[in-house]
């Protein structure tokens, strides 16, 4: 592995880790006491509290490492919602309701084409796993890397 790739991985990891502290989030207990927890929000909060900082690994479903669909699958499974293992399984499951970016809410799914999925956090930001050598965390979109489709999970609020 060349020095540029090592530096790039380190930089991505540092930025992802540092940016996690900048997200104002309610804890699961705070959201529950406020009476606002939907399965969608609970799945996102589970992913954030249990997987942030874990490494990405291709095909990973936890608990030590996850890939993009593995973390989404594991988080929604905590809420009793199952819709397949891969991004294409999720898209073909019949459980997803298409929505616009403006309709997306925290915990909805943001797809980058058909090959990558993350949790929608707020406009311009997602939570998930990017690629081997990075950690699960919060990501800011940019001109060349941004979701192309947004979905609410049927039955998740």
PLM region spans:
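Extended aliphatic helical segments
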Residues: 1, 6, 71-72, 117, ...
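Intrinsically disordered, low-complexity
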Residues: 2-55, 78, 102, 144-157
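Generic detector of well-ordered secondary structure
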Residues: 21-22, 73-74, 120, 128
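Secreted/periplasmic proteins that engage bacterial cell-wall peptidoglycan
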Residues: 39-95, 101-105
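Residues that form or immediately flank small-molecule/cofactor binding pockets and catalytic motifs
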Residues: 61, 131, 155
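Short acidic-hydrophobic sequence patches enriched in Asp/Glu that either
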Residues: 67, 142-143
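...with weaker cross-activation on analogous glycine-rich loops/strands in unrelated enzymes
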Residues: 81-142
């Amino acid at each position: 592995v060349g020095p540029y790739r090592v530096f790039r991985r380190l930089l991505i990891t540092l930025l992802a880790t540092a940016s996690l502290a900048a997200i104002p989030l309610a804890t699961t207990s705070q959201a529950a006491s406020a009476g606002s927890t939907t399965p969608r929000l609970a799945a996102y909060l589970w992913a954030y509290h249990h997987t942030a900082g874990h490494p990405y690994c291709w095909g990973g479903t936890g608990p030590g490492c996850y890939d993009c669909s593995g973390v989404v699958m594991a988080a929604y499974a905590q809420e009793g919602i199952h819709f397949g293992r891969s991004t294409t399984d999720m898209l073909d499951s019949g459980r997803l309701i298409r929505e616009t970016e403006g309709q997306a809410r925290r915990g909805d799914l943001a797809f980058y084409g058909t090959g990558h999925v993350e949790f929608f956090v707020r406009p311009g930001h997602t939570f998930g796993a990017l690629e081997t050598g990075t950690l699960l965390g919060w990501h800011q979109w940019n001109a060349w890397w941004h979701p192309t489709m947004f979905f609410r999970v049927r039955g998740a609020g």
